[in-house]
C-alpha cells in the first residue's frame, strides 16, 4: 500500500510538470567517527565503537513540483558481538518524497523503509525491514530555513515481542553564515502498545547538530554530533551517540543546497534497541 501511494505521488508530480525536469539536485556524503552507547542492561557503562554515516539524495523539479529520493546509512562496528546483548550495529533508511513549492514554502509527503537488526531475521545480527510514511514541510527565510516532518512507522523486530509501531515527528532549523551552514534538529517517537515487550510503551528522543563548511563549490566539509535516548520503562533505557567528521559532494544545478527533509532511520533503530534492552 505504501509503495503504491509513493508511485501515485510520483506520477502526479510528473504529470503536473509536463514530464520535463527543469532542474536536478542532489548530494552524496560520508562521515567517520565514534559511536558511543550506554545501556541499563550493561550496568550503565558507557562504551564506544567506531562508526560511520553515509547518505545521498537525488531529485528534480517540474515547475512548482518537486520529487526526490534519499538513502541514509548509520553503522556501528560491533564485531562478533550479538546486537541483542551488546548494542545495535546501526540502521538505514530510504525514501521517496514528493510535493509542491509555494514561493518560499514547500509542502509534501514521503514514504519509505528502514532496515534494522531484529531477531525475526535469519541470523542474530541480520536485518529486517519496516515501513514509514508521513507529511513534511520547509519554509525558507533568506539564510534561515525551518523544517518539520510528521509520520508513522511500523518496525517489528521480534513478532509479538519487540517493535516500534507509532508516530514520530521531527523539527529543525538551518542557517547559512558566509561559507558555513549550521543546522539542528530534534526528533521524537512513541510506540504506545508494544516496544520492549508486548503491551508496553516505549519512546525515543534524538538531537542532532551539524556544521557544514563549503571548501569549494563541489566540496563541503562536515562536523556532526547526534544523540538518541531510548526509554522502554523506568528500569530499561539506552543512549546512542555519534561524533563524525566527513565530506559532502553536491550534485546538480543547485550546488551546495542542503537537503533537510531526510527519511529517518530512527524508528528502526529504536526497534533494534528495544530488543537489546529486552
Predicted regions and their residues:
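Repeated loop/turn-to-beta-strand initiation elements of outer-membrane beta-barrel proteins
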Residues: 24-25, 62-69, 102-109, 143-148, ...
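Short glycine/proline- and aromatic-enriched beta-strand/turn motifs that initiate or cap beta-hairpins
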Residues: 20-81, 273-278
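Residues that define the transmembrane beta-barrel architecture of outer-membrane proteins
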Residues: 46-54, 75-77, 88-94, 101, ...
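Gram-negative outer-membrane beta-barrel proteins
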Residues: 32-44, 48, 75-83, 104, ...
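Gram-negative bacterial Sec-dependent N-terminal signal peptides
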Residues: 1-21
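Flexible, glycine-rich linker and terminal segments associated
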Residues: 194, 214, 218-220, 228, ...
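Residue-level signature of outer-membrane beta-barrel architecture
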Residues: 58-62, 98-102, 139-141, 173-177, ...
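Transmembrane beta-barrel strands of outer-membrane/channel proteins
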Residues: 28-34, 69-75, 109-113, 139, ...
